[in-house]
Swiss-Prot record:
Organism: Proteus mirabilis (strain HI4320)
InterPro entries, per the entry: Ala_racemase/Decarboxylase_C (IPR009006), Arg_decarb_HB (IPR040634), Arg_decarbox_C (IPR041128), Arg_decrbxlase (IPR002985), De-COase2_CS (IPR022657), De-COase2_N (IPR022644), De-COase2_pyr-phos_BS (IPR022653), Orn/DAP/Arg_de-COase (IPR000183)
Sequence positions bearing N6-(pyridoxal phosphate)lysine: K103
Family classification: Belongs to the Orn/Lys/Arg decarboxylase class-II family. SpeA subfamily.
Pathway given in the UniProt record: Amine and polyamine biosynthesis; agmatine biosynthesis; agmatine from L-arginine: step 1/1
A Pfam family: Orn_Arg_deC_N
A GO BP entry: putrescine biosynthetic process from arginine
Example GO molecular function: arginine decarboxylase activity
UniProt: substrate binding residues: F283, D284, V285, G286, G287, G288, L289, G290, V291, D292, Y293
Cofactor(s) essential for the protein: Mg(2+); pyridoxal 5'-phosphate
Protein's name according to its UniProt entry: Biosynthetic arginine decarboxylase
Primary role: Catalyzes the biosynthesis of agmatine from arginine.
Length: 635
């Protein structure tokens, strides 16, 4: 395979842009990963990786997450470097800290890989459980701890304990009811609290996550409440404790203009708070830094029209400009960019377990006295074989669709046989295929027909995974993730396909796919070879998906492999999660596996079966209880 074909693969699946330098097509027709783009020669073929891990760990079954902690560290360095350049470029005198909100992915490998990257990093918690995890890791980071979310006294005491232990812990006031508890608990612990305030902005982004920002946001104080908070702290003699201003526009901000507008509005809060005597030293712009899941570099919900440098420049310039205009000190800037840190580092890889294809066979003419809709379908087919016919492709399609509808109606009323229905459906597929060949993608009038027929004629690939467990955002909010075969892409991509999971739910289907510089409802695929079914990669699933996944049909967490590649290309990895067993999932819903096994044993004994068959049934049942929840290939 030559470089031209590799470039075509890059373009077909738009890997160059969503891959971010971490993923690319290689000259074997497979997909490779580069955990550290600073060392571009150190790459790893994903197909070979899966085979090697399975050879050395025979119990590893697909689906499995393949995680690359070095990508996390590279993302951290890249974001920090972008803000360093922005501060130098604009003469910004304040510091900068990237804070990781662990809600994005609380896995130990994520937190500790980021902390051990050798870069400044803070941690953010939004619950008591998360705060306990953060405090336990606090001695490993020299930055700040930000405490967001709703708080009770236990949460507040935990945060103040961290401050008492010498950490820089900010309790961000989200509701006015919190400040009374904070002041009371601080007095009991004899500690000066370090406070922040989350201001609710009028500015709001657009897209799937816009509700997390703006005036209707779940969290934050309105302008009048901010003033009340200041009065409360002044009366308590604790106004100097209020040191951090926090706001949040929304997650995955697609448009840089929305970010710039929001930062400028928040900068006015900074100015006004200083006028009121509040010495704000930290400016937390929250989340919003998006990633380009589509690779379209656009304002689409699953894309972004900016890069790291432009984001950093807009944030630093807006804050610095407001400070300079009002002769105020430059505060330390904080961003909570969890998605941008984690999305790229994880790939879900699974196997295709079956394919439903539209097979085209020669059609025999119907009987002379065939029912009208069947005869009409055949007339359309014969017309299409005659060159120079004046009817349009669109007209042929519409006529055949109407005839097929009549066939189905007459079948329901008992007027047509099953054989006649099958014949009509087969002929309709042949008509669609014939029309599809004659359509011109450059003709705008043909484009809707092309899309319609691609969906109708596409192959159905059944993949061994649960959409609800592994890609919950694809189901819940129709988020797009890059999906493609990780092997066999040197073959002609002359088929269109949709991917379906193995749950008993009609929602278990991926609706949108990256296709070139756009998004389609089907994806390009090579012809399916049942002897060598391709493995499918679901990319950029490192943010939120692991923790949001649910247990629909009792499909559990997948296995996970942490992979490291040094500068010389030497590979090391560890199986960090073996994946949930059936017994694990049954216990989640309070079904005791031992009790179930005993009840099954009783049924088998009472069935008066041959003893050898009894033993076989019991062995299979027990083996299944402690086996993988996903489909397993027979040895």
């Amino acid at each position: 395979m030559n470089d031209n074909i590799a470039r075509k693969m890059q373009q077909t699946y738009n890997i160059t842009y969503w891959g971010g330098g971490y993923y690319c097509a290689n000259n074997r027709g497979n997909i490779s990963v580069c955990p550290n783009p600073d060392v571009p020669e150190a790459t790893l073929d994903l197909t070979e990786l899966v085979k090697q891990v399975q050879e050395e760990h025979s119990h590893l079954r697909l689906p499995a997450l393949f995680c690359f902690p070095q990508i996390l560290q590279h993302r951290l360095r890249s974001i920090n470097a972008a803000f360093h350049r922005a501060r130098e470029s604009y003469g910004y005198k304040g510091d900068y800290f990237l804070v990781y909100p662990i809600k994005v992915n609380q896995q130990r490998r994520v937190i500790e890989s980021l902390i051990n990257a050798g870069e400044p990093l803070g941690l953010e918690a939004g619950s008591k459980a998360e705060l306990m995890a953060v405090l336990a890791h606090a001695n490993m980071t020299s930055s700040v701890i930000v405490c967001n979310g709703y708080k009770d006294r236990e949460y507040i005491r935990l945060a103040l304990t961290g401050e008492k232990l010498g950490h820089k812990v900010f309790l961000v006031i989200e509701k006015m009811s919190e400040i009374k508890m904070v002041l009371e608990e601080a007095e009991r612990l004899e500690v000066i609290p370090r406070l922040g305030v989350r201001a609710r902005l009028a500015s709001q982004g657009s897209g799937k996550w816009q509700a997390s920002g703006g005036e209707k946001s779940k969290f934050g104080l309105a302008a009048t409440q901010v003033l009340q908070l200041i009065d409360t702290l002044r009366q308590a003699g604790r106004l100097d404790s209020l040191q951090l201003l926090h706001f949040h526009l929304g997650s995955q901000m697609a448009n840089i203009r929305d970010i710039a507008t929001g930062v400028r509005e928040s900068a006015r809060f900074y100015v006004e708070l200083h006028k009121l005597g509040v010495n704000i030293q930290y400016f937390d712009v929250g989340g919003g830094l998006g990633v380009d899941y589509e690779g379209t570099r656009s304002q689409s919900d699953c894309s972004v029209n900016y890069g790291l440098n432009e984001y950093a420049n807009n944030v630093i310039w807006a804050i610095g400009d407001a400070c300079d205009e009002n002769e105020l000190p430059h505060p330390t800037v904080i961003t909570e960019s969890g998605r941008a840190l984690t999305a790229h580092h994880t790939v879900l890889i699974s196997n295709v377990i079956g394919v439903e294809r539209n097979e085209f066979t020669a059609i025999t003419p119907p009987a002379e006295d065939a029912p009208r809709p069947i005869a009409s379908l055949w007339e359309t087919w014969e017309e299409m074989q005659t060159k120079g016919n004046s009817r349009s492709l669109r007209e042929w399609l519409h006529d055949s669709q109407l005839d097929l509808h009549d066939v189905h109606t007459q079948y329901v009323h008992g007027m047509l046989s099953l054989t006649e229905r099958a014949w009509a459906e087969e002929l309709y597929l042949n008509i669609c295929r014939h029309i599809q060949y004659d359509l011109d993608p450059s003709n705008r009038a043909h484009r809707p027909i092309i899309d319609e027929l691609q969906e109708r004629m596409s192959d159905k690939f059944y993949v061994n995974f649960s959409l609800f467990q592994s890609l919950p955002d694809a189901w819940g909010i129709d988020q797009l993730f890059p999906v493609l075969p990780i092997e066999g892409l040197d073959k002609p991509l002359d088929r269109r396909a949709v991917l379906l999971d193995i749950t008993c739910d009609s929602d278990g289907i991926i609706d949108h796919y990256v296709d070139g510089d756009g998004v389609e409802t089907t994806m390009p695929m090579p012809a399916y070879d049942p002897e060598y079914p391709p493995m499918i990669g679901f990319f950029m699933v490192g943010a939120y998906q692991e923790i949001l996944g649910n247990m629909h049909n009792l499909f559990g967490d997948t296995a996970a492999v942490d992979v490291y590649l040094d500068e010389k290309g030497n590979l090391t990895y560890q199986l960090s999660e073996e994946g949930d067993t059936v017994a694990d999932m049954l216990q989640y819903v309070k079904l005791n596996p031992a009790v179930l096994l005993e009840r099954f044993r009783t049924q088998v004994k009472n069935a008066q079966l041959d003893k050898a068959l009894q033993e076989q049934f019991l062995t299979e049942f027990e083996s299944g209880l402690y086996g993988y929840t996903y489909l397993e290939e027979e040895e």
